[in-house]
Amino acid sequence: MVTFWAETAASAATTSKGEPPSKKRKTNPSPPPSLLSLPDVLILNCLSRIPKSYYPKLSIVSKTFRDLIISIDLNHARFHHKTQEHFFHVCLKLPDRPLPSWYTLWIKPQGFDDKEEEKKKKKKSTLVQVPSSYASQTPLLVVGIDSDVYAFKQCYPPSRVMFVRNKECVIWRNAPDMTVARANPVAYVFDRKIYVMGGCAETESANWGEVFDPKTQTWEPLPVPSPELRFSSMIRKIEMIQGKFYVRSNDSKDSVYDPIREKWNVAAKPQLNDSRCSVGNVWYSCRPNSFLWFDNEIKNWRLIKGLSSLNHSCRSGLIETVCYDGNLLLLWDKPTKPRRRVCEDKYICCALISFNKRKNGQVWGKVEWSNVVLTVPSSYRFLRSTVIRT
């Protein structure tokens, strides 16, 4: 019932905004006046049960809705009612902006359009810049240890703050500060400790990495990597391979840290256009000419059927693969005018893939949707992605 009301309200808001007053049209039902007159706490209760995909349209229904949608109280209500959703965020460096920009993937809810023809013409998803009515705040970098969740800011100015909360509680509280201020650091949990790296000024290079022990509530510096191993750009992510930290950068090199020997070294870049991701208990590999899955029974990679059209679309320019609500989310770019030698802009494209293992053991993939989500200058740089539940 609440979702039906959301669709009606969003449709009314779109119609009133998109058509001139002089044009005769069929009147769409407006949101019930009684609902708008309710106390804020009851409106929040309703909004918290509606998928966030409706929020951009609902925010133009009234000022009350707009203020409540961007409020922290709505996040608390969604946590209380267990209606939180997963959201995919990307961080891009655009040539005309001095600081990195965060975007959130907005996915159109089913039944959002009235006409079937409009569904086919309009995009299923798009990247929306943060902040917006869809994502009011820059996403936090979140890691968990036992029953506690720790978070770091991914924005400017640099901050020493680390937050912590119990998984059953929505309220964040301050944890012991890091030893230096960091902007967009990266964090990883190993041996029940939190390793934090990057994001600090050159003058703070002695504290480029540090580790937090929740038992003692103290920070300790990591050994200082040599200058060539301290990246000039934002660290993309950390991967644990055979007991070592592989620090993936957006520079021409990566680095590796051995926590046992406490030593840094140069790491080889992963194979180009071979992006691997785990969905459930299965590993998938996206390569220039094929999609593969790893069969644990025979310990070998096998071809995924049904994705030949997508193979042609993203055979080059693959940016990222992530697990998203039990499916595989792909991000890639391509020139807006591929036949030209020099192209000023690129399309960033996204696709959602579901998988089905059949009786013969063969895995088939299905493209749930695929479209262009953003147009950017060709000189842009992809910095990082994250999936957050909120």
Swiss-Prot record:
F-box domain span: 32-79
Question: Keywords in UniProt for this one?
Answer: Kelch repeat, Repeat
Biased-composition ranges, Low complexity, are: 1-16
Q: Report the InterPro entries cross-referenced here.
A: F-box-like_dom_sf, F-box/kelch-repeat_ARATH, F-box_dom, Kelch-typ_b-propeller
Q: Where are the Kelch repeats?
A: 139-192, 193-243, 245-286, 288-321
| Presence of keyword Repeat | yes
Q: Where is the stretch described as Disordered? A: 1-33
Q: SMART domains in the record, alphabetically?
A: FBOX
Coiled-coil blocks: none
For this protein, the record's SUPFAM superfamilies field holds:
F-box domain, Kelch motif
Q: Does the keyword Repeat apply?
A: yes
Name it: F-box/kelch-repeat protein At4g39753
Organism per entry: Arabidopsis thaliana
